[in-house]
Amino acid sequence: MSIKYVASSKLPTPWGVFTMHGFEDSDTGKEHVALTLGTLDANTPILGRIHSECLTGDALFSLRCDCGFQLQTAMQNIAEAGQGFILYLRQEGRGIGLLNKIRAYELQDQGANTVEANERLGFPADMRKYDMILPMMEKIGIKQVKLMTNNPRKVKAMKELGIEVVERIPLQVGKNRYNEGYLKTKSTELGHMMSEYHFTGEEKE
């Protein structure tokens, strides 16, 4: 995999002014982004998140998943901490792409869960890869992290790449009547570390 740094710019947000760093994967043509806030010290554990692209949740405010809620909460937590990072990876639909994600949603509308839908389309439950994060982390100068995630695969990926995960911080937000089944499947079939008793915030109607 060949990840090339392209450019950086300021990104004003409701939670503060982040710096946006652009990267290109010359093998796939995909473009990834790292957001950083504050002064980052390689010798200090930095609060952060690996976030896979979710157009429906991040930009279209879908209640079918918890992705948009997690992204916003992560950015808010980083702003409150005064420093941190988000690696925004272009792996829509756990790696199957947007149109296949819509096809999977169609199957879910007919009763399949999120894993069954992917498998009926001929895909694994989760196709995401995380090897691109190492050059991104090296560029922004982070070696130790406090990782906001419920996904043990992300913790494992960072450790295998030589990045020290000092702490895993649960990020359980956004539960509502449209995504209860999805969240249960993520916990029971994808191994995400979640408990319904730990969700925060009001349920959406």
Curated annotation (Swiss-Prot):
InterPro entries: GTP_cyclohydro_II, RibA, RibA-like_sf
Keyword annotations from UniProtKB, A to Z: GTP-binding, Hydrolase, Metal-binding, Nucleotide-binding, Riboflavin biosynthesis, Zinc
Cofactor binding notes: Binds 1 zinc ion per subunit.
GO cellular component, one term: cytosol
GO molecular function: GTP binding; GTP cyclohydrolase II activity; zinc ion binding
PANTHER family reported for this sequence: 3,4-DIHYDROXY-2-BUTANONE 4-PHOSPHATE SYNTHASE, GTP CYCLOHYDROLASE II-RELATED
Designated name of the protein: GTP cyclohydrolase-2
Organism: Shewanella sediminis (strain HAW-EB3)
The organism's taxonomic lineage, starting at the top: Bacteria, Pseudomonadati, Pseudomonadota, Gammaproteobacteria, Alteromonadales
Gene coding for it: ribA
